[in-house]
Amino acid sequence: MDTHIWVWSLLEPGRLSRRVSKALADPANEVWTSPISVWEILVLRQKGRLILQPDAMAWVSAALLRVPLKEATLTHEVAMATAQVALRHQDPADRFLAASAKVYGLTLVTSDRNLLAGKGFSVLANR
């Protein structure tokens, strides 16, 4: 799932569509996250764009334990796949999330228009 979807699912679940909420809650679905999302959360906190209590590291550690998540490990294959996903912009975090979805055969849950318009990986729109 995209970083903002993970954060919203924990802090602002009302921002998720019914379809996305249902998909995330369905025990038949595996929910995956990427280390890139952890990095992105920490960067957003450093820039003051995200407030986390008691602090960012503690929040991320607790968030990783709160719901069962599988880790989409960053591998050489994922790094190479960043060149195979078609995105309108060059945001490295988005490229790694899209490439992870491609390599692991996952559906990337997002509200990001750039990712929704991308090609080479599966998406579920939060609408």
Where are these regions (language model features)?
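Short, conserved active-site loops that position catalytic residues or coordinate cofactors/metal ions
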Residues: 35-40
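Active-site neighborhoods of divalent-metal-dependent phosphate/nucleic-acid chemistry enzymes
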Residues: 51-58, 65-113
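Short glycine/serine/threonine-enriched helix-capping/active-site loop
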Residues: 33-34, 74
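Generic structural signal for small/hydrophobic residues in well-ordered secondary structure
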Residues: 3-4, 41, 82, 101
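Basic, glycine-rich
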Residues: 123-125
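Hydrophobic side chains within alpha-helical segments
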Residues: 5-7, 43, 94-98
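Short, well-structured N-terminal submotif of metal-dependent ribonuclease cores
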Residues: 1-33, 47-62, 66, 104, ...
